[in-house]
């Protein structure tokens, strides 16, 4: 029983630290921004009690700083164990199918979100526009955030859940970690996509005991969304039918095409995702 309680407390602590690092990064970047604009330290602290510094630069810097702090802290404290064994196994074919799987999930996920008619909070929309509308935002959205989130939610949270429910089906741990991952986004607009992605990411972690496939899937997903946002500006506020020029038939065809990518990718990954062989 003591081990179970310790595991639960460990997971709670990981989540608290993850949130605290985001808050710390927000205040740190905001204060530095105000100091850079000529405000003294005391006045900056007082200003932040009732105001929020919001600009493309501060949003990007905050996201990048919190991600770097998260990666460094979790790995240095070994909350997320780091090993090169999976990469040394040269799983390039499996990672190729991970890329295809990620591409195949984007349109179905967007369609599902449309059917739920969940409104994106204005604050979240402003933050996403700030991140997506600046080329430097890709450093955070496309690279650092995938590594940080996989480090926390698969490398630490799911790993601990698997230990906590050892002897039971791994899917219990995968579902719980996916739910935690979805709720950690703190809004209903992102929860469905995050939960479904969490199931895939968790499944890949269990099959490989590595966060590398998850980072690749997460990277492709975020990179594709970033690219579409900048190449098709109407995608920011429009539905799929708007993106496809008002053709509902094109939407159905894109969904079918996505499934033709996603399902074979899942089949291939069910055969190819394996734990690295132990080094003799």
Predicted regions and their residues:
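Functionally important transmembrane alpha-helices
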Residues: 19, 23-31, 190-247
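Alpha-helical transmembrane segments in multi-pass membrane proteins
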Residues: 18-77, 96-97, 253-257
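Hydrophobic alpha-helical transmembrane segments
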Residues: 8-16, 60, 95-99, 135, ...
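Juxtamembrane helix-loop-helix connectors linking adjacent transmembrane helices
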Residues: 32, 39-54, 79-148, 156-163, ...
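C-terminal membrane module of polytopic membrane proteins
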Residues: 50, 219-280
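Hydrophobic residues within alpha-helical transmembrane segments
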Residues: 144, 176-180, 216, 220
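Membrane-interface helix/loop boundary segments of multi-pass membrane proteins
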Residues: 148-176, 203-210
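Structural signal for the C-terminal ends of transmembrane alpha-helices
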Residues: 72-82, 204-208, 263-273
């Amino acid at each position: 029983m003591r081990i179970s309680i310790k595991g639960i407390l460990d997971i709670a602590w990981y989540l608290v630290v993850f949130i605290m690092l985001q808050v710390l990064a927000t205040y740190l970047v905001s204060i530095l921004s105000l100091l850079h604009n000529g405000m003294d330290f005391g006045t900056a602290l007082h200003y932040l009690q009732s105001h929020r510094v919001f600009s493309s630069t501060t949003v990007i810097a905050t996201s990048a700083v919190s991600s770097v702090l998260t990666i460094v802290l979790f790995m240095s404290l070994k909350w997320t164990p780091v090993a090169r064994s999976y990469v040394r196994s040269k799983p390039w074919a499996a990672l190729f199918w991970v890329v295809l799987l990620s591409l195949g999930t984007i349109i179905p996920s967007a369609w599902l979100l449309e059917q739920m008619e969940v409104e994106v909070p204005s604050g979240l929309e402003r933050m996403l526009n700030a991140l997506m509308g600046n080329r430097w935002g890709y450093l955070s959205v496309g690279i650092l955030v995938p590594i940080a989130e996989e480090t926390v939610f698969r490398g630490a949270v799911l790993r601990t859940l698997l230990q906590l429910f050892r002897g039971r089906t791994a899917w219990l741990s995968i579902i719980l970690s996916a739910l935690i991952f979805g709720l950690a986004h703190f809004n209903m607009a992102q929860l469905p996509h995050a939960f479904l992605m969490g199931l895939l990411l968790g499944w890949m972690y269990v099959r490989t005991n590595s966060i590398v496939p998850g980072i690749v899937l997460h990277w492709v997903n975020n990179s594709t969304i970033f690219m579409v946002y900048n190449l098709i500006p109407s995608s920011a506020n429009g539905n799929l039918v708007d993106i496809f020029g008002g053709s509902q038939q094109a939407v159905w065809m894109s969904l079918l095409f996505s499934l033709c990518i996603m399902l074979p990718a899942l089949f291939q990954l069910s055969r190819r995702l394996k734990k690295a062989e132990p080094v003799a």
